[in-house]
Amino acid sequence: MRGSILSKATVIAATSLLALTACTTDSSIENPPAAETGAAGEATPAAGEPSESSAEWFDQAVFDEQDEQRSATFEGDPAQPYLQYIDGEMTDTSAFAADGAQKACFSNASISNPWRQTGWITMNQQLQVLQDSGVISEMETRDAQDDDNTQISDIDYFIAEGNCDAFIISPNSTAALTPAVERACETGKPVIVFDRGVQTDCAVTFIHPIGGFAWGIDTAEFLSERLEEGDKVVALRILPGVDVLEQRWAAAERIFEENGIDAVDYFTGADPVEIKSIISDELATGDVQGIWMDAGDGAVAAIEAFEDAGADLPVMTGEDEMSFLRKWEETGLDGLAPVYSNFQWRTPLLALEKIFAGEEIPAEWVLPQSPITEEERGEFLTANEGMPDGHYAKFGGEDLPGYPTVWQERQIP
């Protein structure tokens, strides 16, 4: 029996998490208000407040594993990164082989931010393909709107309904959702967990990019290689208590310390006004040579703060959101766009296709997670021309029906 999801890959969380906007077609969903609580309901420090130590989140074994995975060879076609995986233990799914179209039940944490919206659009276009091919009859979806209790009720509703041939679960948080995931497993139907993890190994597969430590290593090494000992980095963080975000900072902080970089971090709630205020205050006390972010929300505001102050632009890491890529090109700053591979939203449905065919799949399906470099930026800008600022460059849906219009128009089901 493989180890628990938590111990093998710690917890995977979304890149841009936990704004409280409900499922809606309102265009304002692109810029939801900042969350007031963390993933498990803990109070979030006031925006602009420095964080406490990240030591409790640092795990050397997981750090080393994800560092190694950054250079791993992935099985599968690089043109289909959403199907690639690192070679490892496989799950025999022959017991789940089925004839005819099957019903999927999807319990989603939310679509409350642009990263999740982009993935949700892609997932629905992938669903259309599998419906047309007769693999899936329908996907009944319940959106928890970033609330643990709602998602627990959603999963229990699916179980009581007794009409699901398979479960797909993107957990809102780790510990709180574990019992509900286990109850879904007890139905005897295949369960797929993706994006963020839970503390059980009962799922047929856990799908996620490499992880938070890999993000932290990519970004902190990039900044450290370009800065000198004693240079100052301002780290902008969305909120505390979300494992993958904490892991990003835990890895980055360790690397900054090793390289003598003076790094100070603040929680921002992804509020552009607060981000500008933090940076303005830091610039008023001295030079800032680098900006590090645990997610790209507010990256443009950070750059604009330097422009408003007439200060030299920093070395900076953002994310593969189009707003950052465009501002990066416009300003010519020295930057890197780390990713939390948005194309992962296709993988659960493609995994179901394999499961219903009785094919083996990875027990832990680790997807590629490669940042966008300056040399690659132009390629991704061209490929995503016409996409809205909230779109994510590595969304992986170019071969799906509706491309590019569905994503350009942000047609959120």
Where does each model-flagged region fall?
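Sec-dependent bacterial lipoprotein signal peptides
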Residues: 1-21
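A residue-level marker of the well-folded mature domains of exported/periplasmic proteins
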Residues: 2-5, 22-413
